[in-house]
From Swiss-Prot:
Function: Catalyzes the attachment of alanine to tRNA(Ala) in a two-step reaction: alanine is first activated by ATP to form Ala-AMP and then transferred to the acceptor end of tRNA(Ala). Also edits incorrectly charged Ser-tRNA(Ala) and Gly-tRNA(Ala) via its editing domain.
Catalytic function, reaction form: tRNA(Ala) + L-alanine + ATP = L-alanyl-tRNA(Ala) + AMP + diphosphate
Gene Ontology CC annotations of this record: cytosol
The entry's keywords: Aminoacyl-tRNA synthetase, ATP-binding, Cytoplasm, Ligase, Metal-binding, Nucleotide-binding, Protein biosynthesis, RNA-binding, tRNA-binding, Zinc
Protein name: Alanine--tRNA ligase
Source organism (scientific name): Bartonella henselae (strain ATCC 49882 / DSM 28221 / CCUG 30454 / Houston 1) (Rochalimaea henselae)
Family: Belongs to the class-II aminoacyl-tRNA synthetase family.
Recorded GO MF terms: alanine-tRNA ligase activity; aminoacyl-tRNA deacylase activity; ATP binding; tRNA binding; zinc ion binding
Positions that bind Zn(2+): 564, 568, 676, 680
SUPFAM superfamilies in alphabetical order: Class II aaRS and biotin synthetases, Putative anticodon-binding domain of alanyl-tRNA synthetase (AlaRS), ThrRS/AlaRS common domain, Translation proteins
EC number(s) stated in the UniProt entry for this protein: 6.1.1.7
Main location: cytoplasm
InterPro entries, per database record: aa-tRNA-synth_II/BPL/LPL, Ala-tRNA-lgiase_IIc, Ala-tRNA-ligase_IIc_anticod-bd, Ala-tRNA-synth_IIc_core, Ala-tRNA-synth_IIc_N, Ala-tRNA_ligase, Ala_tRNA_ligase_euk/bac, DHHA1_dom
Length: 887
């Protein structure tokens, strides 16, 4: 039997033998066509080659391109499961010529493959040509020998292809297979062409013109070829059937869904099994290409596909998540051709299971509401749109899921009322937001989101993409264009630029159009998902709705990724060394450094910092894989994932895991697990090195570490090493002996300082170190007074001097003011015990403090101290004190 895999291989090998380059399928998320939600044809990845914007090292190519048609103008979702040939995911086989061969060789290659390689009977084939394409008509006669009645001229747009209103275009020639008169339907161009008897299996597009404008079309100097053959369709033909769902690939998937559910694919259950098999393919491939279920853009299309399949699983009586259990069969069937399925198996499986668990919680309640609301409805009636909106808003039912659930009863939904309810919710949200105190400028982003939706973020998968300008803002107002030298903000429908959040700063780079270059200085996220690109027009003029190319500064992004992953490792290391009380209180992730704030009641010792750094670097040296997955927030927390300070999370969260905990040489668990929407390295080894450069206090109970990574850390340590060698030279010792040499010097200094201090105290008491003549003992109102100003005596030693002075005079008041090298004054004043009943040392020392610029003083009645910044007024302070005693 011709299996799907063998047919694909035969096609590619055939064209390779005929001089074509086998080119891998491009991702389902187009990088070079922002007008498309998903890749839906083989030529999408070659669009810029056909238009001359891109050159490739080959002139002929062949591909097996994965495609999705669900959402946007190409939407087959509603029909999947109910027809023989509609799919959300399909493979497009194609061969392409970029200005090389043209019609004759294209027709020959296609006819030869079908009749010689695939061995299709010639009498089962017929072709169509554009009504005035005489060249193709004659070539078909010559090459195939088909009679004129099997070369059908078609005058409609079905046989003329155009890339858009302008650009490459040309006539088509379609090849049909006749399944026989036992199946209803007529040939193309007839009144019964919509039947299933004649099925198009291959479309050959002859790009020979350029549409200059609506009225003008000119010949291309180098005409090209673009062909497309649906793999599922040709497989059905080659396997002797006319229904795509009867091919080996779908039979394998449906066999497993029958086995798991215990329900045969017969009668009313055929559609459910087919929906599950088809939707598993599109879901798995979209997840593998970086799309995750969400409530916006591509992610919402994926969610709609998944939930539609989940409702059909419910119809089959499945009590547990079903789709993920079919995944091994899909990977067995398609994993060799598409290794991305194998690489992403864990992510796909977990995402499918998670989404089904999450939706199952509301599915039955929502279906109960739908059943109750539609009980009295009959065929041809409409379900109230407000009920459909409640199912959407409260129970997570996409509109098309509700429509699909009612389809078998012939009941539709009042879509206009549904849309009205949706608009009412948006208006309520706007009213609530307008009272939140945000600035007028911020209000713009809410308006943009309301009209255009959230920005599609592509930055996890790529640093370069195309997009369409959806808003230009200058001086707080939306404008139609911006010109060179003007600072402005750009909004694009999709972007690889990361918007600042979770401590990670926004990306920078360039956005360029046909006639302008815009330098992005920063990227921010506003209004729950609108990415704004802040910067300046460097040249030219940008206009609304223009197609642009967005390029992130990759070097800067790489440094940010490294630092962000390093914060995760440091966070876990802090918890292991200091304790589980450590929680993140804030962070900054920039290209130059990282900063991490955390809860801890005291400073972190040098020994602890070394342990933290060593632990983090051990994980760096593991070079273990950094993985991301989507989980329910409660499940993530229960698995030990740590949340970021100040972040708000929805029901589903992105979980980043890195590092391995090993037990007896086997993986026990991941080392660090955090909820995080930021960008990260692929492996911990990409970080290179982590070095903590400082630790400090931010607030009571909050500490901060700052660190460098990679090259920055290496250069920092290299400079530190150079400084150590310089110091060693100054000390006339080796670098390894610097620590001991410094310790000896400090000990010598301590001894010398003690000796010097002792001599100073002796000198002061003997009157040797004085600043003025006021050091003599004087009698004031019968009270002995000793006042002295001394230099470089510590407050503690001043107390010793005052005690000695009190003993020396026997009865009286002693005041010493020490002036430090930085000019500050410290005052200590003592009153002998026999005088404390009438003189208080605290009151007297405050007189000194006032002159020294201090804030009072304190102590006991017999001994008090104070100080101030104005040590140069020490003499004046003593004079004022004496005057007070004379009072």
């Amino acid at each position: 039997m011709n299996s799907v895999n063998s047919i694909r291989s035969t096609f590619l090998d055939y064209f390779q033998l005929n001089g074509h380059k086998i080119v891998s399928s491009s991702p389902l998320v187009p990088r070079n066509d922002p007008t498309l939600m998903f890749t839906n044809a083989g030529m999408v990845q070659f669009k810029n080659v056909f238009t001359g914007l891109e050159q490739r090292p080959y002139k002929q190519a062949t591909t097996a391109q994965k495609c999705v048609r669900a959402g946007g103008k190409h939407n087959d979702l509603d029909n999947v499961g109910y027809t023989a040939r509609h799919h959300t995911f399909f493979e497009m086989l194609g061969n392409f010529s970029f200005g090389d061969y043209f019609k004759e060789e294209a027709i020959f290659l296609s006819w030869n493959l079908l009749t010689k390689e695939f061995c299709l009977p010639e009498d089962k084939l017929l072709v169509t040509v554009y009504h005035n394409d005489d060249v193709s008509t004659e070539l078909w006669r010559k090459i195939s020998g088909l009679p004129d009645e099997k070369i059908v001229r078609i005058a409609t747009a079905d046989n003329f292809w155009a890339m858009g209103d302008t650009g490459p275009c040309g006539p088509c020639s379609e090849i049909f297979y006749d399944h026989g008169d036992e199946i209803w339907g007529g040939p193309p161009g007839s009144a019964y062409e919509d039947g299933d008897r004649f099925i198009e299996i291959w479309n050959l597009v002859f790009m020979q013109y350029e549409q200059v404008n609506k009225e003008k079309r000119v010949e291309l100097p180098h005409p090209s070829i673009d062909t497309g053959m649906g793999l599922e369709r040709i497989a059905a033909v080659l396997q002797g059937g006319h229904d795509n769902y009867d091919i080996d690939l779908f039979r394998a998937l449906i066999a497993v869904s029958q086995e798991i559910t215990g329900v045969k694919a017969t009668g009313d259950f055929i559609a459910s099994h087919r929906v599950i098999a088809d939707h598993l393919r599109s879901s798995a491939f979209l997840i593998a290409d970086g799309v995750l279920p969400s409530n916006e853009g591509r992610g919402y299309v994926l969610r709609r596909i998944m939930r539609r399949a989940m409702r059909h699983a419910h119809l089959l009586g499945a009590k547990e998540p079903l789709m993920w259990r079919l995944l091994p069969v899909l990977i067995h069937e398609m994993g060799q051709a598409y290794p991305e399925l194998v690489r992403a198996e864990s992510l796909i499986s977990e995402t499918l299971k998670l989404e089904e668990i999450r939706f199952r919680k509301t599915l039955e309640r929502g279906l109960g509401l739908l059943s109750e609301a539609s009980t009295d409805l009959k065929e041809g009636d409409h379900l109230n749109g407000e009920i459909a909106f409640k199912l959407y808003d409260t129970y997570g039912f996409p509109l098309d899921l509700t429509q699909d659930a009612l389809r078998c009863r012939g009941i539709s939904v009042d879509v206009a009322a549904f849309n009205k309810a949706m608009e009412g919710q948006k208006a309520k949200a706007r009213a609530n937001w307008s009272g939140s105190g945000e600035t007028v400028t911020e209000a713009i982003w809410f308006s943009v989101r309301d009209q255009l939706g959230a920005t599609e973020f592509l930055g996890y998968e790529t640093e370069k993409s195309e997009g369409i300008l959806t808003a230009l803002v200058r001086d707080g107002e939306i404008v139609d264009d911006i010109s060179s030298g003007q600072k402005a903000i750009l909004v694009v429908n999709q972007t690889p630029f990361y918007g600042e959040s979770g401590g990670q700063i926004g990306d920078s780079g360039t956005i360029s159009g046909k006639n302008f270059v815009f330098e992005v200085h920063d990227t921010q996220k506003k209004a729950d998902g609108v990415f704004i690109h802040i910067g300046e027009v460097k040249s030219g003029q940008a206009r609304m709705s223009e197609c642009v190319e967005l390029t992130v500064d990759g070097v800067r992004r790489k440094k940010i990724r490294v630092n962000h992953s390093a914060t995760h490792l440091l966070h876990e290391a802090l918890r292991q060394v200091l304790g589980s009380h450590v929680t993140q209180k804030g962070s900054l992730v920039s290209p130059d450094r990282l900063r991490f704030d955390f809860s801890h009641p005291k400073s972190v010792s040098l020994e602890e910092l070394e342990k933290i750094e060593d632990l983090a670097n051990e994980i760096v040296l593991q070079n273990s894989e950094v993985t991301t997955r989507l989980m329910l927030v409660d499940d993530a927390i229960s698995e030990g994932a740590m949340a970021l300070f100040g972040e708000k999370y929805g029901d589903e969260v992105r979980v980043v895991s890195m590092g391995n905990r090993l037990e007896k040489g086997k993986l026990k668990s991941r080392w660090s697990i955090e909820l995080c929407g930021g960008t990260h390295v692929e492996r911990t080894g990409d970080i290179g090195l982590i070095h903590i450069v400082s630790e400090s206090s931010v607030a009571a109970g909050v500490r901060r570490i700052e660190a460098l990574t990679g090259t920055a850390a290496r250069l920092y340590l290299s400079r530190q090493d150079a400084r150590v060698h310089e110091i060693a030279d100054l000390l006339k010792t080796s670098a390894t002996d610097v620590e001991e040499r410094v310790r000896i010097l400090l000990e010598d200094r301590r001894k010398l300082e003690k000796e010097l201090n002792d001599e100073r105290k002796k000198s002061v008491l003997s009157g040797g170190i004085v600043k003025s003549d006021q050091e003599d003992i004087t009698i004031i109102n019968g009270i002995s007074f000793m006042g002295r100003v001394v230099k470089n005596i510590s407050p503690r030693d001043l107390k010793t001097l005052v005690d000695s002075g009190k003993k020396k005079i026997g009865s009286g008041v002693v005041a010493f003011i020490g002036v430090s090298e930085d000019g500050k004054g410290s005052a200590v004043l003592g009153v002998t015990d026999d005088l404390t009943h009438k003189l208080n040392a605290v009151d007297l020392v405050r007189i000194l403090s006032g002159i020294l610029g201090g804030q009072g003083g304190g102590g006991r009645p017999d001994m008090a101290q104070s100080g101030g910044p104005k040590g140069n007024k020490a003499d004046e302070a003593l004079a004022v004190l004496k005057a007070s005693l004379e009072g």
